[in-house]
Swiss-Prot record:
Homodimer. Its cofactor is pyridoxal 5'-phosphate. It catalyses: (2-aminoethyl)phosphonate + pyruvate = phosphonoacetaldehyde + L-alanine. GO terms for biological process: organic phosphonate catabolic process. Belongs to the class-V pyridoxal-phosphate-dependent aminotransferase family. PhnW subfamily. The keyword Flavoprotein does not apply. The gene is phnW. GO terms for molecular function: 2-aminoethylphosphonate-pyruvate transaminase activity. This is 2-aminoethylphosphonate--pyruvate transaminase. The lineage of its organism: Bacteria, Pseudomonadati, Pseudomonadota, Betaproteobacteria, Burkholderiales. The modification N6-(pyridoxal phosphate)lysine is found at residue 194. PANTHER family: 2-AMINOETHYLPHOSPHONATE--PYRUVATE TRANSAMINASE (PTHR42778:SF1).
Length: 370
């Protein structure tokens, strides 16, 4: 447990935040105040620097969850006659398909197994089969299982074929290396409440300036128009509509801690240690991972559920919650699984303690794993 006896959130976001991040939300901010506007700009500057986009990219923050930002990116950046390829190996890829359907944007779905990352060859084949494809909407880290898709290879093939790549980096931004200097990526979407260890409530799109400047009047939405949001901020330094002031203040503090920790390499290394501690401990209890180690991202791990007839996830979840650890409820894979996150303001001590709590819960409920 963290100070105050709050539970540890072993989820991919919202997640356990530091006391300093929570404390940052105790101050009220005026949404048109110059100090708040400077804070917005400083946050955007840092977000761009994390992915090395200083020269060609701009950051557009947006009120709401990460999905709001994904929908804003698709609705703004894809023209009316565009056609989007969506490699689909999980629930968040499927959500992109649903967004495109609602927006009335033509798209091609590339179905994949839940445990199989997309390959550059598969995307190249899709381009050759359908030359009308103009864009690719790619989830970097498919959080439904913790599957890592090979972003650099995908970006390279998109660049080679002249296709625009929009990346959902919701659960990878800040934890895994992303370098926009390599080219091939037009837009990168993430949110405050994931690996940056802020709180939920703000998405953002880091987008190539030249791509965004060609999008005036394209979005079918007022609130989710990235071009208007950016143009208004450039003109006034303010948000178009009421900003999530406390969320932004928390993110500013979270970014300060991110930088002090050593940036993405250090954050990613801590999460990797957490993941290793979790996997080793769960395997010692008899659990098996859903993914192989070579495609497992150090953010959330999916485990096969025990075959013991006494296993009931709801009962298991409640018992682990009572012990002070909140797992991710429910499964998103087709087979019977459950997920445990390893990100947030936690370290290996918390992971070891969580595994011990899970072990005690299994004994208490009389569940055999092996």
């Amino acid at each position: 447990m963290i100070p105050g006896n709050d539970p540890i959130l072993l989820t991919p976001g919202p997640l356990t935040t530091s006391p300093a991040t929570r404390h940052a939300m105790l101050r009220d901010w005026g949404s048109w105040d110059a100090a708040f506007n400077r804070m917005t700009q400083s946050v955007c500057t840092d977000l761009i620097e994390i992915v090395h986009g200083e020269n060609e990219y701009v950051c557009v923050p947006l009120q709401g969850s990460g999905t709001f930002a994904v929908e804003a990116a698709l609705g703004t950046l894809v023209p009316r006659d565009g056609r989007v390829l969506v490699p689909n190996n999980g629930a968040y890829c499927a959500r992109i398909v649903k967004v495109l359907q609602r927006l009335g944007i033509a798209h091609v779905e590339l179905p994949l197994r839940e445990d199989a990352p997309v390959t550059a060859a598969a995307i190249e084949d899709a381009f050759n089969r359908d030359p009308r494809i103009t864009h690719v909407a790619q989830v970097h880290l498919e959080t439904s299982a913790g599957l890592l898709n090979p972003l650099d290879e995908i970006a390279a093939v998109c660049k080679h074929y002249g296709k625009s790549l929009i990346v959902d980096a919701m659960s990878s931004f800040g934890a895994l290396p992303i370098d926009l200097r390599r080219g091939g990526i037009d837009a990168l979407v993430s949110a405050s409440g994931k690996c940056l260890e802020g709180v939920p409530g703000m998405g953002f799109v880091i987008v190539r300036r030249s791509a965004l400047e060609a999008c005036e009047g394209r979005s079918p939405s007022l609130a989710l128009d990235l071009y208007d949001q950016f143009a208004y901020m450039q003109k006034t330094t303010q948000w178009r509509f009421t900003p999530p002031t406390h969320v932004l203040a928390a993110l500013r503090t979270a970014l300060d801690q991110f930088i002090a920790e050593g940036g993405q390499p250090a954050r990613g290394a801590r999460y990797a240690r957490n993941c290793a501690a979790l996997v080793d401990g769960m395997k010692a209890l008899g659990f098996e991972t859903f993914l192989t180690a070579d495609v497992q991202a150090p953010v959330i791990v999916t485990f096969h559920a025990p075959r013991d007839p006494k296993w009931q996830f709801a009962e298991f979840y409640a018992a682990v919650r009572e012990a002070g650890y909140v797992l991710y409820p429910g499964k998103l894979t087709q087979v019977e699984t459950f997920r445990v996150g390893c990100i947030g303001s936690i370290g290996t001590n918390e992971m070891h303690d969580a595994v011990a709590a899970i072990g005690r819960t299994l004994i208490r409920l009389g569940i055999r794993v092996k």
